[in-house]
Design a protein with these regions (language model features):
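General N-terminal targeting signals
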Residues: 133-135
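Beta-strand-rich solenoid/repeat architectures in extracellular/passenger domains
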Residues: 1-5, 14-28, 38-53, 64-77, ...
Length: 187
């Protein structure tokens, strides 16, 4: 693995995928990447992704996403739209997000001031979440007006905080000579 591909990259600029246009993305790829305060990525067309870990649109650093088109993502751990660090995500009434596979996510949110307005449709085939968010996202910043997420699992799910373990002392383990070290990593 040498990296990932991006269909349209917009940092400190605006980008548009026009109607009748198609962006194809593969494994570990991103259809549209947008970053920078107030910069806008608009999708009126189609974004198709086939391959594990692919993302239709990735937004960060106070950028804005408006989806008026269709995002189709197929593979394990795929995401339709991912927003972080103050991104604003708008899935229009005409916006459709289809995610198929294991552990898929329609819209993923993380970071302070990240916001979502979902007026569109999120369809899930397989296992996953329509909308998932980390604890850093205020629930009041998530507005899902349609309630049309289709899938076998929850519509919204707050992902747990990752635990932090800090040892400021000593840890002594005496298990004799019958201890299996496989899979143990000490940092």
């Amino acid at each position: 693995k040498t990296g990932y591909s991006v269909g349209i990259y917009g940092e400190n600029s605006n980008v548009t995928n026009n109607a009748s246009k198609i962006i194809q993305v593969g494994k570990d790829g991103i259809g549209v990447y947008i970053a920078g305060a107030g910069n806008v990525a608009e999708n009126y067309g189609i974004i198709n992704g086939v391959g594990d870990n692919a993302k239709g649109i990735f937004a960060t650093d106070n950028s804005i996403v408006r989806n008026y088109g269709t995002i189709n993502m197929t593979g394990d751990n795929v995401m339709g739209i991912a927003g972080q660090n103050g991104a604003q995500i708008y899935n229009d009434a005409n916006g459709v997000i289809n995610v198929t596979g294991n552990d898929v996510t329609g819209i993923y949110l993380s970071g302070d001031n990240t916001k979502l307005i979902n007026n569109g449709v999120i369809n899930i085939s397989g296992t996953g979440m329509g909308i998932s968010y980390t604890p850093t996202v205020e629930l009041s910043n998530i507005n899902d007006t349609t309630g049309t997420t289709i899938g076998s699992t929850s519509k919204q799910y707050q992902l747990p905080d990752m635990p932090t373990l800090v040892n400021r002392g000593e840890i002594n383990i005496n298990v004799g000579g019958n201890f299996n070290y496989d899979g143990i990593r000490v940092i």
